[in-house]
Amino acid sequence: MISRVTYQGDLRTEAVHIQSGDVIVTDAPIDNNGKGDAFAPSDLVATSVASCMLTIMGIVSKRDNINIVGTTAEVEKTMSSSPRMIESITIKLFFKSKLSDKEKKKLERAAKTCPVEASLNEKIKKKVEFFFHN
């Protein structure tokens, strides 16, 4: 078991990571009867894609001694209304370190092997943009 999720009432859940005890709270979004006080479950899906990409790039950067510390991802998600589902996810990756062309290509390839992104429904439009420091 990786987590235990408990419904707290009022469209809010609390997920506990069993190994670490870390907690994630979700709330329904305002456009779906919620308060929007925390990540919506669909926000976590989109955010998980970015986190996965950064993690996979981190594995490659550690192996190949490439500095990507401080790299950030901005995540955008749109929902469709009928059926209500994620319509599109856009990830913008911003690198703070100066990287060679070879390192850039290596990191771009790594990001595109993210298993979370590969697991998403093919109907979801996905866009990834890379912004490298000059």
Segments from the language model and where they lie:
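Short glycine/serine/threonine-rich phosphate/pyrophosphate-binding segments
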Residues: 55
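Extended beta-strand/beta-hairpin segments
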Residues: 1-47, 58-134
